[in-house]
């Protein structure tokens, strides 16, 4: 097989994935435009909000203040699940618990494995509401966020719950937080709204999410060994025939990493957790059917094929600039490479428009992200491949790594 043929095959595969994401972008925009407020309910079921917290003193005042302002017509109880904090998390949690009748400060017993999933399972065991809502300890949801999730859940018995939108509260802090905020907008437009419109597929994002208690009981709660417990939970829920509708109007704001080191730690944990979920999906025949087949293909595409093609495109670009690779078809291959960059940037522009965050600065950062932020993912994925390989050989249990706050 000639070099030209190989390049054509690789370029075609890359462009097929780009085309798929273009379709998701259009579908996401249509979903956002079509989305109407959920129907109000005659009777609102009881809701328990679970907030896992470990050393969250720096952000907890804002979080619990936002929880105190949530407007919900039914019974609402908030459980601050204090996971052995050593800072002033306990003082802040107790301050609110002493003053508000529906906020509870729960001290979670020490246990193993450490992490969010174990704390959430404990929270489910000490609460009794019909619906369980999860927020991270740095979140500030809009007052109507929970109500919107509940109303969407109640529209259909197949709805396991619902998932809302996450926005970056510190997006203007620096270049990194701006790029993270833009990344979140694109993810929620394509992978949430776009996939929901086309395939009726939604994925929990770990916060601003609702799940029926009955569904949790049916699937056995959260997998306490999963570092990406939200994705893993979504896969098991989908395997049971449930769906997770996406509610763009239910909005929460959260803090994102402000330094590269913290970002790498956070995303390494996410990648590790998602690779664990891929392994579980591939190995478990009970999960490997129905709409989860699409989830498997998509996750394999993102974490294996797309990363390989992104690396290939970088090599292709450099060789083209240096004049080492000069293969021309109808259009020079370097021109096609530039077109992929503009399509990438166009998706970010579409996401900012849908979130009413369009600006010259965001468009400029959208272009720069391809050459900077996106390339960091190559390093992260390769790093985590080696991590998974060495820890599998040594039979080492993965360890939860909490994201520091600012």
Q: How should these model regions be labeled?
A:
Residues 65-109:
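Acidic donor-binding segment of Leloir-type glycosyltransferases
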Residues 101-109, 113-119, 123, 129, ...:
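Long helical/loop segments within the catalytic core of UDP-sugar-dependent glycosyltransferases
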Residues 6, 26, 30, 39-41, ...:
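Membrane-embedded multi-pass helical conduit in multi-pass membrane proteins
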Residues 45-48, 77, 217, 232:
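Cell-envelope/extracellular polymer assembly enzymes that use nucleotide-activated donors
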Residues 234-252:
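Catalytic donor-sugar/metal-binding loop of nucleotide-sugar-dependent glycosyltransferases
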Residues 183-188, 264-285, 345-350, 380-386:
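Catalytic core of nucleotide-sugar-dependent glycosyltransferases
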Residues 24-75:
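N-terminal signal-anchor transmembrane helix
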Residues 132:
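Short aromatic/hydrophobic "clamp" motif used to bind/position activated sugar donors
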